[in-house]
């Protein structure tokens, strides 16, 4: 008879614990009911991305020393660096640099470990194309700065919440 009492007590404790977990989940659901909707009309309204947003990579050709650190730290060995050794000055001369954004996972390791800071992350996230080969950017395409959202008069930017003026 004693084991039956302990099983009944365990059943009661498990029931109370389950009810508490369901209640906690329900309270979280109810707390979200007070929030305002965050849906935006995307092509016409855009959110301002954070400073640490990992968008398209910007490349500065003049700063690059062709050390290939970016290739070594990339988990998928993505950046393609073509260089030529100048024997008279015993330095590498960069010929071509390209990144295929169809394969890139935007981890940011290349930007973080670059010794000359020739790579940086931009806020550009609209990289969609109809042909995947257009996502292979060479040094010229990587060197272009993205058009700022703030300067485009056709797009209304959404900050946090609209302020009510009294």
Curated annotation (Swiss-Prot):
The keyword Flavoprotein does not apply. Its cofactor is [4Fe-4S] cluster. One of its GO terms (molecular function) is quinone binding. It comes from Silphium perfoliatum (Cup plant). Disulfide bonds: none annotated. Keywords: 4Fe-4S, Chloroplast, Iron, Iron-sulfur, Membrane, Metal-binding, NAD, NADP, Plastid, Plastoquinone, Quinone, Repeat, Thylakoid, Translocase. [4Fe-4S] cluster 2 binds at residues 74, 104, 107, 110. PROSITE patterns: 4FE4S_FER_1 (PS00198), 4FE4S_FER_2 (PS51379). Its EC number is 7.1.1.-. It is a peripheral membrane protein. This is NAD(P)H-quinone oxidoreductase subunit I, chloroplastic. SUPFAM superfamilies: 4Fe-4S ferredoxins. It is found in: Plastid, Chloroplast thylakoid membrane. InterPro entries: 4Fe4S_Fe-S-bd, 4Fe4S_Fe_S_CS, NADH_quinone_OxRdtase_chainI, NDHI.
